[in-house]
Design a protein with these regions (language model features):
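Conserved, structured C-terminal
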Residues: 1-16, 104-324
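Acidic, proline/glycine-enriched N-terminal capping motif
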Residues: 1-91, 96, 221-222
């Protein structure tokens, strides 16, 4: 069995009381001493920091690079201008989802692409098969995400001029505490946020700089899951990867349940007639909703909002409704 990899922030996580867990070949923080619920609420009320160093970061730069990558993106028909970025889905020639991604056009035919750590091998295989020549920057660049209503204020307190920060759909090269950084706007959790990519040798410097503002808290994988679930964000979900990208977007919906029990991934959702109409891709209690919720895949199409459903949650039948 291969040895688990660690991010440059491992020791900082341990110092802050993180519970570390194995995930797709990495050891990452599940939650910190405050607990996942408090971390979730901190992201919604102030700001939260996320260790994204395990994610894949790639530069794709050669004549015709944008045209080559366009055909691999679900929203590839929509042009990007230099300095722009967007969330997208990498897919193969058959339209099958390979990985969610964020793609930034740094300059003409010069792209910076990030994918979740769970999907790096599949993304690299796709790039190779389509002759999208790439350079992996994952070992050389660290990435810290910050999300929440005080994200912008945090970076301003770190010395960045507010007018220099990227707006929605933008990526910029900025200086942060004397270091050059690729900073991309991000709204993955339905909160304003930024992904900050910088020299991995200076991870402690940037981590300390952000925490010294006394605004953001560090948050782990558990909070990431519930924040993304509430926001309906498509993540690196094993159930959805390998399905048609169009179906991933058109046939998935949020289902909320009464109480705190949520059905787990793979559990079938039944309608009032007892017919299986969906499968849970991920489920959890969501602190922001104050109830359990699940992201579900409806192979025959999403029923009307408010449609009642029920499912088994660890031996207990739970009732829910389809969200809007």
């Amino acid at each position: 069995m291969a040895e688990l990899k660690n991010t440059p922030l491992r020791e900082f996580h341990l110092e802050m009381g993180a519970k570390m867990v194995p995930r797709s070949g990495w050891t990452l923080p599940l939650h910190f001493s405050e607990g996942a619920s408090d971390e979730h609420h901190c992201c919604r009320s102030k700001a939260a920091l996320f260790d994204l160093c395990a994610d894949g970061r790639y530069r794709i730069a050669f004549p015709g690079a944008w045209q080559c990558v366009q055909k691999l993106l679900f929203y590839g028909e929509n042009e990007l201008q230099p300095g722009q970025c967007r969330r997208d889905i990498l897919m193969n020639k058959e339209g099958i989802a390979v990985a969610p991604c964020q793609v930034s056009l740094m300059a003409a035919d010069d792209l910076f692409v990030t994918v979740p750590f769970q999907c790096t091998a599949k993304a690299e295989a796709l790039f190779q098969s389509e002759k999208a020549e790439f350079v992996s920057l994952s070992e050389y660049l660290a990435c810290i995400g910050i999300s929440g209503p005080e994200s912008r204020k945090t970076l301003v307190m770190c010395g960045v001029k507010e007018e220099d920060l990227p707006g929605e759909g933008e990526t910029k090269l900025l200086e942060l505490d004397g270091l050059r950084a690729i900073v991309s706007f991000s709204q993955f959790f339905d909160e304003e946020g930024f992904e900050i990519n910088f020299n991995a040798e200076c991870t402690d410097q940037i981590w300390d700089l952000l925490l010294e503002t006394d605004l953001p808290w560090p948050a782990g994988l558990a909070a990431q899951e519930t924040l993304a679930l509430e926001a309906g964000s498509f993540g690196a979900n094993e159930f959805l990867i390998s399905r048609p990208a169009a179906d991933v977007l058109a046939k998935t919906a949020l289902v909320t349940f009464e109480g705190r029990r949520a059905p787990l991934a793979g559990v079938k959702l039944l309608n009032e007639e007892g017919k299986e109409i969906a499968a849970v891709t991920t489920g959890a209690y969501c602190p922001g909703l104050e109830r359990a919720a699940a992201w579900a895949y409806f192979p025959e199409g999403i029923p009307e909002a408010g449609t009642p459903l029920h499912a088994d949650a660890s031996g207990v039948t739970v009732s829910g409704t389809v969200g809007e």
